[in-house]
């Protein structure tokens, strides 16, 4: 990516409430965008046509998690204390899609959930500081809790003497979980807390089961013995029982650099890199060690950015660029591998909005026009999935219909798009 500022190319408007999530997916043999809002509505968009394909109210309150878990299956998780799985195999329909599964879930905090390989990690049902793990059986969608109310703080406390963490002294908890990130290839779970603490765990979801040998003795009714008296006939049977163990959890990372600011964004990249953001101007790039629980063994790049109030961070690893969305509506693009402590923005984006012109009377009695550009709070960021450019060069003269199709294909197949959701319900696309 060069240093030219990405350009706003289109916006999608059908939500009446603040955007809570955005995700681009490949669905129904086309690139689609799924967006959700703070009143529980979901819209699936045709990106090329820039029009809704399906729209329904999935929850009564804010949708916190929105993820496609199979080709035609959507998982949603809302502040109405519910997690649902939907069948979205039908492209066009007026009604809500069939609801395949419903699970009551703790949503006292605004934490997301993580789904992977038929496992689900959620805030614990009895304590928002802890987490539960469920095993999902397909296709019936039967949920079995395999780890209940696990406390990262208790695990941390047991390992406290091994961790060089002076800023964490005196705490008796980490507060509620704000962000969950699961790294599937390494079975790692990273948690960001209300206190600003970050914890990394390794989770063995399938520990070796234990075989228990058992011998059962069955006594028959007593019969006369040839030596006099009574004897018993004993029938011995042996059996082996397989006892499954609950997931094994180990502490692999701990950092308190954000304390006392709550974690608002957490992103994991390849090569053991974790990027975290909080409510201030601080972004931290964690180069952690796989088998060390001491943050002093990690290389921490503590960066200052231009604006406070970090709402969302997404990363483009091909260009070493992170896009930081702030509450004030500004999106910064910065090089996360820069050696500078204060990151220079490669660019700053701010959504194009109509100018508001106000008229007032000055001291001489004349009218004065004031032009102001309104700011709208940014609520969500997402990068488009990678795609091939399908434009075909031809010398044949194109009809108007062909030109319209070509323009749609160009928008839909450009290298990368950055999507931003806003408080007024708009989703805006920027070409990178």
UniProtKB/Swiss-Prot annotation:
WD repeat start-end pairs: 14-55, 58-96, 100-144, 258-296, 395-432
Species of provenance: Scheffersomyces stipitis (strain ATCC 58785 / CBS 6054 / NBRC 10063 / NRRL Y-11545) (Yeast)
Summary of subunit composition and partner proteins: Component of the ASTRA chromatin remodeling machinery complex.
InterPro entries: WD40/YVTN_repeat-like_dom_sf (IPR015943), WD40_repeat_dom_sf (IPR036322), WD40_rpt (IPR001680)
Known function: Component of the ASTRA complex involved in chromatin remodeling.
Stated family: Belongs to the WD repeat ASA1 family.
Main location: nucleus
A Pfam family that the UniProt record links to this protein: WD40
Official protein name in the record: ASTRA-associated protein 1
């Amino acid at each position: 990516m060069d240093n030219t500022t990405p350009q706003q190319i289109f916006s999608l408007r059908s939500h009446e409430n603040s955007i809570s999530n955005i995700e681009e997916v490949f669905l129904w043999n086309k690139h689609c965008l799924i967006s959700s809002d703070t009143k529980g509505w979901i819209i699936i968009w045709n990106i090329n046509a820039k029009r809704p394909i399906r729209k329904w109210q999935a929850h009564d309150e804010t949708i916190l998690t929105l993820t496609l878990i199979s080709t035609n299956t959507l998982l949603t998780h809302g502040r109405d204390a519910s997690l649902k799985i939907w069948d979205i195999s039908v492209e066009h329909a007026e009604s809500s899609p069939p609801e395949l599964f419903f699970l009551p879930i703790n949503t006292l905090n605004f934490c997301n959930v993580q789904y992977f390989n038929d496992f689900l990690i959620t805030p614990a049902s009895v304590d928002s500081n802890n987490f539960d793990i469920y095993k999902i059986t397909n296709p019936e969608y039967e949920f079995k809790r395999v780890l209940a109310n696990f406390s990262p703080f208790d695990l941390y406390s047991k390992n406290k003497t091994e961790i060089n963490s002076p800023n964490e002294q005196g705490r008796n908890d980490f507060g509620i979980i704000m962000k969950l990130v699961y790294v599937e290839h390494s079975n790692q779970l990273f948690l960001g807390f209300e206190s600003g603490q970050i914890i990394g765990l390794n989770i063995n979801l399938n520990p070796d089961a234990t075989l228990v040998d058992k011998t059962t003795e069955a006594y028959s009714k007593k019969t006369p013995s040839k030596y006099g008296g009574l004897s018993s006939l004993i029938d011995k049977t042996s059996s082996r029982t397989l006892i499954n163990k609950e997931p094994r959890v180990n502490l692999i990372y701990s950092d308190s650099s954000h304390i006392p600011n709550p974690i608002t964004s957490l992103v994991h990249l390849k090569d053991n890199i974790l990027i975290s953001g909080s409510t201030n101007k601080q972004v931290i790039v964690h180069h952690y060690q796989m088998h060390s629980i001491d943050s002093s063994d990690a290389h921490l790049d503590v960066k200052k950015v231009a604006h406070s109030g970090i709402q969302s961070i997404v990363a483009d690893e091909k260009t070493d660029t992170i896009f930081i969305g702030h509450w004030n509506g500004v999106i910064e693009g910065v090089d996360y591998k820069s050696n500078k402590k204060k990151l220079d923005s490669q660019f700053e984006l701010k959504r194009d909005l109509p100018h508001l012109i106000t008229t007032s009377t000055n001291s001489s009695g004349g009218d004065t026009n004031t032009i102001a550009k309104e700011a709208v709070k940014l609520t969500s960021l997402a990068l488009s999935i990678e795609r091939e450019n399908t434009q075909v060069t031809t010398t044949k003269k194109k009809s108007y219909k062909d030109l319209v199709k070509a323009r749609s294909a160009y928008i839909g197949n450009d290298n990368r798009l950055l999507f931003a959701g806003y408080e007024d319900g708009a989703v805006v696309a920027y070409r990178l």
